[in-house]
Amino acid sequence: FAAEDIKAADGVSEDYFKTDEKVGTITTDSNGIAQMGDLPAGKYYVKEVKTAHGYVLDKEPRYVDLSYRDQDTPVITYDEKWQNARQKVKVTVLKKEKDTERVLAGGVFGLYTSENIKNAKGEVLLEKDSLIEQRVTDEKGQITFTADLPVDGKYYVKEIFAPDGFITTDEVQEFTFEYAGEDQAEVS
C-alpha cells in the first residue's frame, strides 16, 4: 500500500499511487520470503492479510521508505523480518470435592499427549501418553497449564495425586486443540 501519494518522477505525469492505494500482493515462498520489485521511489506499508495454519495474524503494518537516497544508489532495497506468534491453548482445571463442591488445593494433575506429536518432517517429538506438564492446584482449586502445545493435537488431563485426605480419581479429560483461526491468539 502507498503510505503517501507516490508522484511521477517528472512532476507532470499522473501519480503512480494515491495514499492507501493497494500497490500489489506478495506471498511468501516455501522459505518464508516474499519479494516485490520495480516500485517507484516513495513511502509504502505492508500489511499481512493472511497467515499460515496454526499462527496468529499480525495486523501491525510495516512501513517501508524507498525514497531517493543519492546518485550512487541505483536500487533501493528493504528487508523486514516478520515473525508470527503460534496460536496458544489455555487449559484450566478446577478440583472440587465431589459431594460439597468445595474447592481443593494440593491436587497434582498432569497434561499428556493422546497421540504421538510429530514435527513438520514427520519425526516423533513426543510419544503418545507422554507427560507434557505437571501442576498443583492452588488455594482456589485451580491449575492453568502453560505448555506451548502444537495446534490440531489431541491431549488429556488426569489427576496424578489427590490432595491430602482424598482418593485419586481415575477420570481422564480429553480434548483436541483445534486451530481457531488467524484472529484468535488463545483458545481455552
Language model: regions and residue ranges:
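Solvent-exposed loop/turn and edge beta-strand elements of beta-rich ligand-binding domains
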Residues: 1-188
